């Protein structure tokens, strides 16, 4: 699908792709929360990464988080847990602090989840550098979407932003292979941050390199997402996805729609608590359903709804909602709080 290589079309593409990336058919959390099932489960199968991007904890604070890879037998237990949710989880997304392709068994993880239909859709976010002839065919036939984060347009730019030497031409060839073998169901989403395409020439090169390969191509603003992390790139691009000023968010939407399964089984209410401060359960000893409907989640949601987000970490210093989310529960907080209390009272009575 050939796209014109000019700034006007680039802007139009972004407006179109944002509907795919954020799903314009979104559930109104203000009217629906608390939900019976999480909409999204983030699956962190490893915390290892082959890059050290200058805006990431892997570069800024590499000694402040545990390195590890998820056990496959534990993953199968988690998948069994997912099947207990009614309605079914909308999306299982392989992502996390590490790059999923660093897990040598990642194709087995994906195949098992897809074969057992533990969610409605399956996605992976990756830098794509470890795509190869062995994993490309499997991922291309199982995933509903592969999201590739591009960090530069040549070897030198990758070194500038990720502190790693790569073979950019080989990387592009593997993306081309994936694009050719994937089925129609699978979308290849290629995105790059605006710091890497900060001129018209670079924007045109980005489209020239990847528009024919991608079903979706997107330039996103480079913003800070990690609590307590200060990048040396001066991340001041406004909102990650939309052209709108930052606004303070009192109630985090993430804790009403998602959970992350960390590599060691700890369950987090979101995907950016890289220091593992806000643990809501442990899937080694608890079911995901019990965690989702448990007292710890109720207390966390209640604190936010009561305007207490800034009284505890990492929520107090988290920039995710202001910089990256488009859902907002602030104006519906009182109504949601009443429904949360009703839900958990019913659970206690049952």
Please describe what each predicted stretch is.
Residues 85-95, 114-115, 120-123, 142-152, ...:
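Conserved C-terminal portion of the radical SAM core fold
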Residues 131-134, 199-200, 268:
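Short, well-ordered alpha-helical microsegments
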Residues 2-145, 157-161, 165, 169, ...:
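Conserved alpha-helical substructure of the radical SAM core
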Residues 35, 249-253:
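Short loop/turn motifs at secondary-structure junctions and domain boundaries
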Residues 41-45, 49-50, 71, 99, ...:
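Generic structural signal for small/hydrophobic residues in well-ordered secondary structure
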Residues 173-176, 180-188, 210-250, 266-268, ...:
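C-terminal accessory region of radical SAM enzymes
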Residues 48, 52, 251, 314:
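The −1 position to Zn-ligating cysteines in a subset of zinc-ribbon hairpins
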Residues 55, 254, 317:
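Short, cysteine/histidine-rich loop/knuckle motifs that typically chelate Zn2+
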């Amino acid at each position: 699908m050939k796209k014109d290589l000019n700034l006007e079309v680039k802007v139009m593409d972004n407006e179109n792709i944002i509907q795919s990336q954020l799903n314009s058919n979104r559930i109104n959390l203000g009217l629906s929360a608390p939900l019976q099932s999480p909409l999204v489960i983030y699956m962190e199968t490893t915390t290892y990464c082959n890059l050290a991007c200058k805006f990431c904890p892997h570069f800024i604070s590499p000694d402040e988080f545990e390195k590890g890879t998820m056990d496959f037998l534990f993953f199968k237990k988690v998948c069994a847990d997912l099947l207990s949710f009614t309605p079914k989880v909308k999306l299982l997304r392989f992502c996390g602090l590490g790059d999923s392709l660093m897990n040598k068994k990642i194709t087995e993880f994906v195949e098992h989840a897809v074969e057992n239909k533990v969610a409605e859709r399956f996605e992976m976010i990756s830098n794509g550098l470890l795509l190869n002839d062995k994993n490309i065919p499997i991922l291309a036939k199982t995933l509903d979407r592969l999201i590739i984060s591009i960090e530069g347009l040549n070897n030198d730019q990758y070194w500038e932003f990720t502190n790693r030497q790569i073979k950019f031409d080989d990387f592009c060839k593997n993306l081309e292979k994936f694009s050719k073998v994937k089925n129609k169901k699978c979308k290849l989403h290629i995105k790059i941050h605006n710091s890497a395409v900060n001129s018209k020439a670079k924007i045109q090169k980005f489209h020239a390199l990847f528009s024919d390969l991608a079903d979706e191509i997107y330039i996103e603003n480079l913003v800070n997402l990690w609590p307590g992390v200060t990048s040396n790139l001066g991340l001041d691009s406004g909102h990650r996805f939309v052209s709108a000023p930052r606004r303070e968010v009192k109630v985090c939407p993430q804790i009403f729609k998602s959970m992350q399964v960390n590599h060691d089984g700890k369950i987090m209410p979101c995907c950016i608590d890289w220091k593992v401060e806000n643990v809501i359960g442990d899937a080694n000893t608890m079911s995901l359903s019990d965690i989702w409907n448990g007292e710890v989640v109720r207390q966390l949601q209640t604190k936010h709804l009561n305007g207490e987000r800034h009284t505890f970490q990492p929520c107090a210093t988290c920039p995710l909602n202001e910089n990256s989310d488009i859902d907002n529960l602030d104006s519906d907080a009182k109504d949601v709080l009443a429904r949360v209390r009703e839900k958990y009272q019913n659970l206690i009575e049952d």
